[in-house]
């Protein structure tokens, strides 16, 4: 198994940040090469948000009491205090990127970028650009260069912009009406 991850101030403890509208706590990637199963179960969730990008293979995610098999080209969003239960299997050759984030205005920021309340799966398609953003955030958290916290936040905003339905499907929206009125009303 290949693992690359980094944590703000090298702490694996989840936290809630109220000083910033958005703040990155940790970021990483897993690529299953030799192990048969990688389970995660947090019955009470965490106090931050988690976004997982299935870049290859598939993941078995549980939400609303049911198993959902999520293939590559999708992202899964878990909110604070929400049970997190998911599994990756080696036979699926899964590669996943993940990020934990918090902040005083996360819910409104997600809404601004088109995330719906209660939505778990974001159909993103596969893109090396997503993987690159996650890898950049991992690098920033590892190197801790000046302004790295802001750089992580900037890159997470960039990811959200790329996931905005108005960015992913602009032609579908222009057929129904003006892009501004649909996307930012």
Describe the predicted segments one by one.
Residues 65-79:
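Short acidic-glycine-tyrosine-enriched beta hairpin
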Residues 21-24, 46-48, 93-95, 149, ...:
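A structure-centric signal for secondary-structure junctions around beta-strands
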Residues 67, 81-105:
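Ligand-binding loop in jelly-roll beta-barrel domains
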Residues 1-68, 117-118:
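Generic protein-terminus/edge-of-domain signal
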Residues 109-174, 181-185:
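Amphipathic alpha-helical segments enriched in hydrophobic/aromatic residues interleaved with Lys/Arg
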Residues 35-38, 72-73, 81-83, 91:
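Tight coil/turn sites that cap or link beta-strands
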